[in-house]
Amino acid sequence: QRYLPRVLALVIRVLIQTMQMLWTMSVALPRPTHVLLQTPPCVPSFAVCALVCFVRRAKFVIDWHNFAYTLMALKMGGRGSPLVRLAKIYEKMMGRLGHAHFAVTNAMATWLEEEWGIGGAVVLHDAPPDFFGPIDDETERIELLRRLQPALKVPTRLKVPNDSRDDATDTVYPPYTLWPREDQTTALVVSSTSWTPDEDFGILLDALILYDAVASKEQRGAFPRSYDILYPNLLVVVTGKGPQRAHYESRMKHLKLNRVVLRTAWLESEDYPKLLGVSDLGVCLHTSSSGLDLPMKVYDMFGCGLPVLAARYDVIHELVREDTRFAGGSVGVRGGVRLPEGGRKGKARDVGANGCLFSSPAEMAAQLCGLLRGFTIGQSEAQAMRGGLVEAPRRRWKQNWEEIALPVFT
């Protein structure tokens, strides 16, 4: 791509991938009974797999996780682009060649049948593998946090001058303590993002600015004990790589926050589930290019007993059972919190609720305040919700595969 025009480079890349796939599937591998293709991507894999299945008399099974043309539309200026329309036709035609289909949501299975005439799709929801689970052992938790602390560069205490006078006393904010739990002043919030246009990271930044205004407003003087504060400090760890990461990291450097620390990290594969296992709250900014898929990261968070704040879109209700007490709240720029009546009057949590859904930074900030209020004394809604998730039976991927997917191949 450094030496050729973009379109020509893409054509050459597709041709090379086509030859590699044809060789591997037609010559290098023995004749299969089934070919399972997860999509997207679909170019050139759709056409190659369909051809190989025809020649070698194998069954073509398509695992629909999203639609490639909708992802292309994010980069090509919308679904009206001629190239996007062509990609949609290709995906539809190739999809109809499948002998069996999996869909990740009920809504996607319905859409495939109604819009593309692809019926009989088996709904196969994602589920976390067994190694995603809560870490409640305090020794293991402390060991992990201490090991990650140098990479995250967590401060121990923040001081903010009250004003410009030389004799002014600094405002000393609570220390950033993550252990032991009984003296914990800091809630660990984790978000995994691909740093792409379908995940608006700016919403999280704006919400944290509003939360910081609320938490900073309540502080007056020193806080020698954790239970002197109503709202905890936040250590927000954002994992993942992607094209927009540098842009948002630049913006993060210019934030002046008193009670919130933001860190980006790329973790080893074995550390990511452990980080989820010791965290207090998860955030998902995924909104789906098609509006029909669900974020795998939320399944992983639930597998670790982690309540989630997720961006609101049509099918997210298939995964996140919303605590409606905090829906529609807001936070003003001066730190004023407005919660719905149910959130203000201590209404009981909705049965089975495992998170909240937000549509704006102000609503997300209000949910952070509502869920984390009382965190330092162990009486927050987030902690109660996490306890319920940890105790609830968790469906795992192995069970999903054996009960739902395997019969398609037998």
Task: Please describe what each predicted stretch is.
Residues 199, 268-275, 280-302, 310-318, ...:
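Nucleotide-sugar-dependent
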Residues 44-47, 51-55, 62, 68, ...:
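Membrane-proximal helix-turn-helix segments that form the acceptor-binding/catalytic region
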Residues 357-369, 373-410:
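A charged, aromatic-enriched C-terminal amphipathic alpha-helix characteristic of glycosyltransferases
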Residues 23-45, 58-61:
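Short N-terminal targeting/anchoring amphipathic segment
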Residues 102-103, 108-162:
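Helix-loop-beta element that forms the nucleotide-linked donor phosphate-binding surface
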Residues 227-233, 237-240, 245-274, 330, ...:
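Nucleotide-activated donor-binding/catalytic signature segment of Leloir-type glycosyltransferases, i.e.
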Residues 148-163, 171-199, 205-209, 237:
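Conserved donor-binding/catalytic core segment of Leloir-type glycosyltransferases
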Residues 194-225, 246:
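A conserved mid-protein helix/loop that constitutes part of the nucleotide-sugar donor-binding site
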